[in-house]
Amino acid sequence: MLHRGLIEWYEQNHRILPWRETEDPYKIWISEIILQQTRVVQGMEYYHRFIHRFPDIHSLSSASEDEVLLYWQGLGYYSRARNLHKAAQLMRDHEMFKLNNNNINNVATESTPSVAKGKTSELLNSEQIFSALKSMPGVGDYTAGAIASFAFDLPYPALDGNVYRVLSRLYDCEIAFDTTEGKKHFRKLAEELLDREHPRLFNSAIMELGALVCLPTSPMCSECPLNTWCEALAHNTVELLPVRKPRPKVRDRYLEYTIYITPERTTLIHQRKGNDIWKHLWEFVETTSVDFKNDNIDNLRPNQHPRAPKGSNSTQHYTTLHHSTQPQAISLTHVLSHQKLHARFVIKNVSELPDIPDTLVVSLNDLDNYAFSRLTLKAIEFLAQR
């Protein structure tokens, strides 16, 4: 009854999303990685852009990392893009990605090889597919389960934030879902609840229920097809769930960059190295070991600034010195999950660019060809209006 009620609700109320209109493992994989840290509405544009440029695993694997990062620009959590690229290079010839909408139903459910429709073909069984998916960089249990379910209709649960919320309320579970114990517990619940006859449809339905009805705040319990079985609703604890582990304190970090500009409108950029934030993204010349939090900027006056992107979690304040012969300064604040960045971009007009190691001379008109962090993109947006 629970399965049927949920699936019937889904069939009447689900949104039309491009990754639901395909069973191509590659496209479903791309969508799942994008949606790991991005809302559906925000991720839609990026998905279309990414798939348009990299329509299959071969086009992605043969691209440079710089180009992949460029097409990921704005999504954040850039390790996702780097892992996508690595995985594409590792898996480009894997049998799994040779399956498409025309032969997707030929996946073997037993450990023995099967014969494709009209063809002799060594096919993969469900365990081989799940194992292959989990071996890919950036793919864990949830993402592997989601791809196996949505692309191959295999009986694996798909757990995202929406599903954790539905399960925590359905079972009135007070275990923090983002702990090691919680992940194991909720995976067990999801496996027990899964409709093994219709895993693709069931996983889509429970995720959609969390997105449209079982909301983080003001959930629409009266419209929920699972309200008869919901223990949190019966115990009046819906608003208290799900439980998260305490989040680490966000620390302040101060950054300063110099934007050199010649009369020919050229500048210097360099690519970030190491394992810090924005690995392999480009940026202007960073002034190291600078802490300007106590600087006196009373001599700076506000300048007209571009509107922040809709939905941005950044605040921004553009400033410029009174005397036009002096450098300009752009002050920006950008919030990451674990850091609050206070950045200042000092614009210096120079007759020629300084000789700085590991930098690249580029035209300001060509900055669109390089991948930058969202913070640096705001500074570039200001430059475009000068």
Where are these regions (language model features)?
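Intrinsically disordered, low-complexity, charged terminal extensions of DNA damage-control enzymes
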Residues: M1-R15, E21, A211-R386
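Catalytic cores of DNA base-excision repair glycosylases
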Residues: R4-G5, W9-M220, L226-H235, E239-L240, ...
